[in-house]
Swiss-Prot record:
GO molecular function, one term: bent DNA binding
Organism: Pseudomonas putida (strain GB-1)
Domain of life: Bacteria
Region named Disordered: 111-130
Example of a GO cellular component annotation carried by this entry: cytoplasm
Localization terms from the record: Cytoplasm, Nucleoid
Species lineage: Bacteria, Pseudomonadati, Pseudomonadota, Gammaproteobacteria, Pseudomonadales
Keyword Transport: no
PANTHER family, sorted: DNAJ HOMOLOG 1, MITOCHONDRIAL-RELATED
Protein name: Curved DNA-binding protein
Function: DNA-binding protein that preferentially recognizes a curved DNA sequence. It is probably a functional analog of DnaJ; displays overlapping activities with DnaJ, but functions under different conditions, probably acting as a molecular chaperone in an adaptive response to environmental stresses other than heat shock. Lacks autonomous chaperone activity; binds native substrates and targets them for recognition by DnaK. Its activity is inhibited by the binding of CbpM.
Keywords: Chaperone, Cytoplasm, DNA-binding
Pfam families for this protein: DnaJ, DnaJ_C
GO biological process terms, semicolon-separated: chaperone cofactor-dependent protein refolding; protein refolding
Xref: Gene3D superfamilies: DnaJ domain, Single helix bin, Urease metallochaperone UreE, N-terminal domain
Length: 318
């Protein structure tokens, strides 16, 4: 198993703050998103960036990674977790997601470090009722529209008839993400926490949902915003552009003489509310200049500047 230095993967320093880490992740996610990138290894790099952000974007997992990084792990070199590392601490681990063996060896199946948030148990003083379990669960935008369940695994404490803790066991559930969920929303799964002792009732499972940042979409309420890059001639002459949505690409008509910053509304392609009604997708146009140009291209721009009676700063003279 090779060591993964998540700082190197995102291209940030170990001293980077949360804002810099998020910005680096979004840059890589946009670059290697399967709907955007044509590079052969784009999918692998996209998954690698997601994994790095799952760790560095969470304060608790980042602290654990920083600690294990001190053991001398070097990116891409063989590595083995220190003895006893996976048995440290109690609480809920998460098994699932498309993550590497390295990630699973460090964070899988134990509390305080898992792809979708730390976990903690709240001890109830009442009788022999089982403990409640609290987890943070990352939810991707696509999952809010999916009819499929999301599988989660976590650890729950085991007790004997006297209520004394004897160890931990892993519990796996299939959870349906409700329509219209928002970041920070807390849902309760009754009786899905730790088992009771001496005939006592099971504890409950509380999930705090955290909306994971998307590489393409920003969220405004139940609306989605996507930036659509356009070549200058596409904005001037009009075009048909394939635009990603959460459910696949659609063809968007760009009218002639479109402006950078203009928003086009696509009804019903946003997120769902509690009633299942969909918000809108707003395509925000952004005119992008070519990064390089040859002599013939510059000649065309020069001819255009001579013929086009256009002053973009005309309002300054008023």
């Amino acid at each position: 198993m090779d060591f993964k230095d998540y700082y190197k993967i995102l291209g940030v320093e170990p001293t980077a703050d949360d804002k810099a880490i998020k910005a680096a992740y979004r840059k890589l996610a946009r670059k290697y998103h399967p709907d955007v990138s044509k590079e052969r290894d784009a999918e692998d790099k996209f998954k690698e960036a997601n994994e790095a952000y799952e760790v560095l974007g969470d304060a608790q997992k980042r602290a654990e990674f920083d600690e294990i990084r001190k053991y001398g792990g070097q990116h891409g070199r063989p590595f083995q977790a220190p003895p006893g590392w996976e048995n440290r601490g109690g609480g809920g681990g998460f098994e699932g997601g498309d993550f590497s063996d390295f990630f699973s060896s460090i964070f899988g199946g134990r509390g305080g470090g898992n792809p979708f948030g730390g976990a903690r148990q709240q001890q109830r003083s009442a009788g022999r009722r089982g403990q409640d379990v609290e987890l943070e669960l990352a939810v991707f935008l696509e999952e809010t529209l999916s009819k499929e369940s999301k599988q989660i695994s976590f650890q729950v404490p085991q007790t004997n008839a006297m209520g004394q803790r004897t160890g931990f066991t892993t519990k796996t559930l299939n959870v349906k993400i409700p329509a219209g969920v928002t970041d920070g929303e807390r849902i309760r799964l009754k009786g899905q926490g730790a088992p009771g002792s001496g005939g006592g009732a099971n504890g409950d499972l509380f999930l705090t949902l955290r909306m994971a940042p998307h590489p393409l979409f920003d969220v405004e309420g139940h609306d989605l915003i996507i930036t659509v890059p356009l070549a200058p001639w596409e904005a001037a002459l009009g075009a048909k552009v394939a635009v990603p949505t959460l459910e696949g690409k659609i063809n968007l008509t760009i009218r002639p003489d479109s402006q950078s910053g203009q928003r086009l509304r696509v009804p019903g392609k946003g997120l769902a509310n509690k009633q299942g009604e969909r918000g809108n997708l707003y395509a925000q146009l952004k005119v992008v200049m070519p990064t390089t140009s040859d002599e013939s291209t510059r000649e065309l721009w020069a001819k255009l500047s001579e013929k086009a009676a256009f002053n973009p700063r005309a309002q300054w003279s008023k």
